[in-house]
């Protein structure tokens, strides 16, 4: 079903339709389109376009459709709809009839697709942050294990000075951390909601766009409707960040390909990331790394194509902008795959420490040490540089290393050279002298490894925050509540109940992933109950449950609620947060009635605890 047919007296040519349709690309925005539509239905309710009953029917049908899409997203491609917006609307009308035709009131596909795309970019951006962290952890772990593994450092692909394998890993840690920082900044910049901007001049309905933005999890609404539908900066910025990061990954891959070669033999990749030759049975090819290097150009091409597409577009939506998604999807998919594969290449990697040490001793990599030695003896550096160059030529002619020349032979190049020269020509001395911050001295490398690990841990800890639940959290909430209900720890809640009570829930979020939840159910008597508290497996004992409870108690205090209570089998947890035991008989009748849903109702072992918020206020006032 086309969304624009009334103006036309002839059907579109099938060739034009095929050329014009974008469903095969933008079907990936199905969940975002549905979530945006649910939020829009609430906005329409707020301005009286639809009734509360109509909004509930729309929301229920859209949630059903979302579940169907999650179970089988490929079903969308069987349709001949023009785009994902047409498909969602057609499916909705099929579920609720003409009511579905009301949903697009006051909305344009221009602000609709802009919102869908930002929702997708935000979600994908958070996932990419997690993937980058996985690679960083791998690099730091390998660095920690190989702080003492000497590696030749290169300039112009010629041996220059000795470093360590840890130092090499940490160089890429710095690069990938810059990628992480750029991506964080970009996610923050794109976190504005275009919905309600209409085609270009804004919606004609007086809805609260800031509230609409918050319902979709955005920081705020966009400030200019014309810019809102014209803006694709976030697409280009993400592709630019992906391109820079792919450059780093390509350099990483190139280094490792060289280190893995028979000529170097510094490392051996695991069989799991290599392949063989169809002709030469001895081959073990670093295909994973070569593909990372190869896909770099693919991401660059997508970015360049997008910039060329928008460089001369007039403001507001133009059909050219339909081309934004294919390149974006492919670029971010490729980037994500390459980050994951780079991390995988460090699993099972073997470093040939004997070979790297042997290589580091070759190529006169200690020449700079001899020059510094002469400087310490009072010879100007430029003159010392020349003397050492002549000495290297002499060693090459003799076929030996600098440290293998006799003292008499060394004195022939400079009389100031004494027996103590041999100590400074060792690999250990070469490394130890580079003791300034960022150098290869053992203490500096150890410090860098420690600091990198701390940064990762701090970021991991800081990534957890508690906030009010949103419609976009519904799937995570449903799964978590069902998990704990299945264990008999919480009461079961169906999806419709969760949708209805979404405003009572708070969630713990770790880098965009919901990891814990609970709700605050308010009774008429000025009491409130903490329900459905649960934390994802793997995230327990990390303070998330405590943070959620504190958030809900503070919310209750702001609402002037007198007491908050809980029924629990782990009273110790709540007592650490100022809850005290109370009698179940003092609880409202409705609480005990809700227990009818509990599978343990006839053998209840839950303890009732409460926190008196009024008493806390009195105590604080007295202390003050």
From Swiss-Prot:
The keyword Amino-acid biosynthesis applies. It catalyses: 2-(N(omega)-L-arginino)succinate = fumarate + L-arginine. PROSITE patterns: FUMARATE_LYASES, GNAT. Its EC number is 4.3.2.1, 2.3.1.-. One of its GO terms (molecular function) is argininosuccinate lyase activity. Gene3D superfamilies: 3.40.630.30, Fumarase/aspartase (C-terminal domain) (1.10.40.30), Fumarase/aspartase (Central domain) (1.20.200.10), Fumarase/aspartase (N-terminal domain) (1.10.275.10). Residues 1-466 are annotated as: Argininosuccinate lyase. In the N-terminal section; belongs to the lyase 1 family. Argininosuccinate lyase subfamily. This is Bifunctional protein ArgH. The gene is argH.
